[in-house]
Every structure is written in structure tokens, then in C-alpha cells.
Amino acid sequence: MQQTSSAFSHVTYLAAEIGPRPCGSQNELKALQYCENQLKSVGYKTELQSFKTTQSFSWSYFIIVLVAILGALLSWVKVDSAVALGLWAVLLFIGENTTLSPLVSRIIPKKTSHNLIAKLTEGKPKIVISAHADSAKSGLMFHPRLAKNFRLGFLISFWSLVAIPIIAIIILVAPALKSPLLYIELVPALVLAYEAFQLAERELNGTWVCGANDNASGVSVALEAARKLASANAPVWVVITGAEEAGLFGMNHLIRTHLVDLISAYFINIDNVGKGQLCYTTKEGMLFGIRCSQQLTRLAENCAKSLPNYKSVKPCEFRVMSNDSWIPLIRGLPTITLIALENGVPVNWHWPTDTVENVDVENIETTIKLVESMCYSLLNK
């Protein structure tokens, strides 16, 4: 298929003409303003809501990892303090990763980001179509040879974090074992030191990527699906979020400020659909998995069967990284993500090769048809 569709023109404008779109940057705002103009032109009423965000998740986790390493070192001189510090690091990590209590992010310097909310009608929506406009920063942890093992590395780091206070507690209750346990505790501490190096390297040496697949492709699908739904004058919100890559700040702000309106809405999130095996998620979550709405997964399966190339759409569990869908999902709202994967991760994920030339327009067109079919099925219920 020739790369000439209106969907592909959105990808080109966002990823090539605007280029990298860091969280809270002018380029991110330009992308949102472009989307606003596109949606207004087909009859949507729009609103830009602002909020504060960090520019990256890396420094938050860097601080947490340092707290845990300090806890391991304290085991040599003051074990009770090591236990307290180690447990505190675990709680901070869980709070940050689940977004339920991101205490560390609150102390990181902030920028202003925005969400774009577009509505066809007043009142509560039945459907929310979402995609994030910002793009990410590269780093060695996202090198193509390492990215496929990202979740494994994440779990090793988490359990290393957990191991430090556990070992310190054992030292407290069994002092005779202190000497060998202190050396054993150095193993998780070294694992976390490597994690700290990766996080710092990303911030100090990484580059902001163009984000053609992640996530100009998803925004393109949202805009084109919105255009196709415009004539229905239906209770649909199209939400283009900011600051997803920093820690889901945009979607978090949307849910916090509009929960009453969104409590009965279906969420269809679109992320990284520009290359790879197109999938609909059945479970998401990095630390613990939450099943996506069975109603939406069945709907995605049935709607995919109506597509000419339906065999190219598969169910999947996506546990590699949290995306915007995590925010409504953890709050019990019916949610699903459409995403394309290769070896279990998005293609060219957070890497400089995430450019327009590496996006497959056929993937995008298939996703548009799937979103349109799902929305009309929900509206006709």
C-alpha cells in the first residue's frame, strides 16, 4: 500500500515536521494543537487542559534505587536503619510503578504539559479513544538487542530491591549469620547499581526520538477514527494525552479531573500500532497483571474477524511497560489497548530508528478500521 493516506500524513507531520516531542515541551504542545485543529475541522468541541509533569520517569527510579543501595550499605553498620530504608525503597517503587502513590515524582522538577479532550456531544461519554502525543528518550536499556528482555530486567531489579530489606531483617533476627549475609546482600546491590547506571545513562546520554511508531501512529488512528465517527454525533471523547512517557501523567490527570464523567465509559487506548503484529490486550501491568475488559476483548476479537486481514490481529498480554490504559484499568474501568509488537515489544521502541520511514501504513489503516468497528458496535448496543 502506498504511503499516501491521510492517516500517514498525520504521522509524517507529527514525527517528521514537528519531530521529537518531549513531555512538557513546545513540540508536544504543537502536536496537541495540530490534533486540536484536525478535530475541530470535523465538528468536535475541544478543550486543552494543563497539568504539571516530570519530563522522564528515569530520575524518579534512579532516586529509589539509590535509597535501596544505601540501605544495603547501612547493613554493615546499622541494620535496623537498613531495614527501614530498604522497606521504604520497596514501597516507593510500588507507589511509583502502579501510579497509586508516586511520591518520588512529586519532588522532581516539573514542566507544564497538556491533554486535548475532544467531544461530539455534551454529557458523559460512552467511549473514550485515547493516544499519547509525546515521544520518548532513547537509552541503552532500550537498545534493540536488550529491549526484548526489558520486563525480565525490570523483574530482576524489583526482586533485588525486595531482597535487600529481607536480608537485613534476617541479619536482625539471626546475628550469627551477619557476615555471610552482608556479602550476599552485595549481589542485589550490584544489580541495582547497574540499573542506576542505565537510568542515568538514559538521561545524560539518550536522545529524544521522533516517535513515529510511539506514538504518532496511535494519534493518527485516533484522529482518523474520530473523523469517521464525526457524522454519528455520538457520546464519544477523543483524548490525546501528554506526558505518557514520563509516567502516565496526562491520563492520570484526565481520570482525576473527570472521573465522574468517565465512570461508565469504555476506554480504547491506541499505542505503537505502526509496525509489527497488531494485537489487542487481554492483560496489562508490569508488577501485577490486571485483566482487560472481557467485553472489550471479545468485541475486538469479533470486530477483527470482519477485517479482510483479520488473521493479522491477535490477543496478547502486554506486561513490558505501563501505558495510558493502566490508569483506567487499575481503577476498574473497562479498558483495552491496541498495540503492535515484535518479540513481545513495540518495534523501534524508544530508539532513534523510530522514524516515519519505519512505519507501515497498512498497520495503521487496519487499526483505524478495527477502532471504527468496535466503536459502532458499542454505540449500537
Segments (PLM) and residue ranges:
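Short glycine/serine- and small hydrophobic-enriched flexible loop segments
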Residues: A16, L223-A230, S373-S377
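Short beta-strand element of the alpha/beta-hydrolase
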Residues: K126-A131
